[in-house]
């Protein structure tokens, strides 16, 4: 692994393995969506 890179197909930046997530999730800059 490297640093906080948006691994959309592998791991959600170490949060949820095998889960797709936007790059903003890595840098914690995602706008609140409900």
From Swiss-Prot:
Signal peptide: none annotated. Keywords: Disulfide bond, Gamma-carboxyglutamic acid, Glycoprotein, Hydroxylation, Ion channel impairing toxin, Neurotoxin, Pyrrolidone carboxylic acid, Secreted, Toxin. The modification 4-carboxyglutamate is found at residue 3. It is found in: Secreted. Expressed by the venom duct. It comes from the Eukaryota. Coiled coil: none annotated. The modification 4-hydroxyproline is found at residues 17, 22, 31-32. Glycans are attached at residues 7, 9. The cysteine framework is IV (CC-C-C-C-C). This is Conotoxin S4.3. It comes from Conus striatus.
